[in-house]
């Protein structure tokens, strides 16, 4: 399946002086598949090392991370010739081998001509865990501390990319709707409404996407079988895998807290005020108790954090309130499965009167913006005005209102525009494209068109 990140991988390959690349992303977003395809299509050959499955490689790296000796060992083990620039070396699940992470540093410093890509689903979690344990254990000897430092992140020695679930445009490509995707982009530029029949077709596909989501295996099953039930089965398997990771990559006491926060997300999003409240994870819960658990979920890539900003001035980062935030799932399809949303309700999300469907639309927009590299922030003032998202685009701050259907209101948006003199405002809803009174109407299915400088 065609993925947008391929263009970024090709750009990395062609950039002079590129460093070893770390590709991060939640489990099951397609990292291994896309890297193998990249190796097949853009190199003479490639070698993929699954560090979670090949103990021989891990044992070798414990004793030796000299780049040339690592190359010789991999050539012997996989019976393949590794040539600078012509061979892609893929180190998969690098979070399971801290010495492989350290090796990237030496490749960059001593033999940068070798093209290496490391993929890690829980790398941020693993590195954070190693650093935290090192800080807590004051009795650790100097020799042991030096060994533990092997799991430090090679800052400045690697390039980085993140792969997210497939967005709606990639879903359109996978379902042979490339022409529709192009038409949506064209009308986003012109602000002219699509023909009503095309608009309805696009909304229908959007509603299907709410069920299928963007996890590649779910999309693949849908393309092959058109069975939403099969998609739900795949999603449940992925959710079960996430639960297992919580036990594997965290201490037992922390695991309990992680799962409490994770399981509270549907209830958090069901509230009119979607601010994350620790008390919904456990009665009497506080940031001190659950802060580490939330951080684990964010680092794992399974959730997205949307921070409050109390002002609409540039730079928005200066006005973030890190204690006030919303939490979304990284994939809207997984949200539907986790919340046990009836499939028929999602397939008619635009017309169905249901409060949680508003949260589903909001989650969909959040993951779409994040996949486009946009930081997630929302705004509210001291009164009752609140906007689902605010986006910094160059020298402008753009307010974004999200509605699941055609019933829209502009009270909060007008308040923001008047106070901060925004040149344009975005309203994302089931309405067709349009532009009037400084408000750009963006259909839900066109959220993938929103990009920033």
What are these regions (language model features)?
Residues 31:
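Conserved lysine of the Walker
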């Amino acid at each position: 399946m065609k993925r947008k990140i391929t263009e970024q991988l090709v750009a990395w390959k062609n950039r002079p002086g590129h460093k070893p690349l770390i590709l991060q992303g939640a489990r099951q977003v397609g990292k291994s598949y896309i890297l193998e395809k990249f190796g097949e299509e853009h190199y003479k050959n490639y070698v993929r090392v699954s560090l979670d499955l090949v103990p021989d490689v891990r044992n070798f790296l414990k004793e030796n991370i000299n780049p040339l000796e690592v190359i010789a060992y991999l050539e012997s083990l996989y019976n393949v010739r590794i040539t600078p620039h012509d061979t892609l070396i893929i180190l998969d699940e690098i979070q399971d081998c801290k010495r492989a992470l350290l090796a990237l540093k030496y490749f960059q410093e001593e033999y940068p001509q070798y093209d290496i890509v490391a993929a890690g689903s829980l790398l941020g979690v693993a590195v954070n865990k190693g650093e935290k344990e090192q800080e807590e254990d004051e009795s650790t000897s100097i020799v042991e501390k030096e060994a533990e430092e092997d799991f430090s992140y090679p800052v400045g020695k690697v390039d980085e990319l993140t792969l997210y679930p497939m967005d709606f445009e990639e879903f359109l490509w996978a379902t042979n709707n490339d022409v529709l995707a192009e038409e949506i982009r064209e009308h986003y530029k012109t602000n002219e409404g699509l023909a009503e029949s095309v608009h309805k077709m696009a909304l229908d596909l959007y509603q299907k996407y709410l069920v299928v989501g963007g996890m590649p295996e779910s999309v693949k099953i849908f393309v092959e079988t058109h069975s939403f039930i099969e998609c739900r089965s795949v999603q449940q398997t992925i959710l079960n895998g996430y639960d297992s990771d919580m036990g594997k990559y965290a201490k037992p006491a922390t695991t309990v807290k992680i799962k409490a926060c994770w399981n509270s997300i549907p209830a958090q999003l069901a509230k009119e005020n979607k601010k994350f409240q620790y008390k919904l994870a456990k009665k009497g819960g506080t940031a001190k108790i659950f802060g580490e658990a939330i951080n684990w979920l964010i680092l794992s890539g399974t959730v997205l954090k949307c921070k409050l900003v109390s002002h609409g001035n540039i730079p928005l980062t200066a006005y973030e309130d890190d204690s006030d935030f919303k939490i979304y799932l990284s994939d809207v399809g997984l949200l539907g499965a986790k919340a046990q949303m009836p499939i028929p309700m999602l397939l008619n999300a635009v017309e169905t009167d249901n409060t949680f469907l508003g949260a589903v639309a909001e989650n969909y927009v959040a993951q779409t913006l994040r996949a486009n590299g946009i930081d997630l922030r929302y705004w509210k003032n001291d009164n009752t005005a609140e906007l689902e998202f605010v986006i910094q685009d160059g020298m402008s701050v753009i307010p974004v209102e999200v509605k699941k259907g055609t019933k829209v209101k502009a009270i909060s948006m007008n308040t923001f525009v008047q106070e901060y003199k925004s040149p344009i405002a975005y309203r994302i809803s089931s309405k067709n494209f349009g532009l009037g009174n400084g408000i750009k109407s963006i259909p839900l299915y066109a959220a993938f068109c929103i990009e920033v400088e």
